[in-house]
Amino acid sequence: MLFRSFFGSTYNLRPGAAIVDHSRSFAIVRSGRLDVTVLGTFEVEATGRMANYRTLDMASGCPGGSPELAGGAKRVILALEHADRHGRPRLVATATNPVALPRIVDLIVTELGWFEPGGDHFIATELAAGVTRAEVEAATGAPVVFA
């Protein structure tokens, strides 16, 4: 079945696919039937807690629906750039932005590789092609253990 989005993109829906409105999508999230959610965030701590908003005095953002998505999904994956636009690490020992909820993320994917929270360090489970351990260690704001 072909579906054309509001912006003109065409998608081929597979059997089992569903299109729902905003309120029903959050009903699915709250029901506990969501297997995986993929989110972005400003920072993620080595403990796995994500800081995904800033306060008003920080001039940007609010948590939106991500606390509900993270709390309602069985598995939480973060997809983000390894450093912010100023070159500061986004994988850190302790977040400088507010932590939205204590939920621990399961996997962090950046352009440098795949990482899991390890408590006081990150576990690099896979590095991107051509990326060295030294590059990962230099770009990360917490210790990194390589699996």
Regions found by a protein language model. Give the residues of each.
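Conserved phosphate- and dinucleotide-binding cores of soluble alpha/beta proteins
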Residues: 1-147
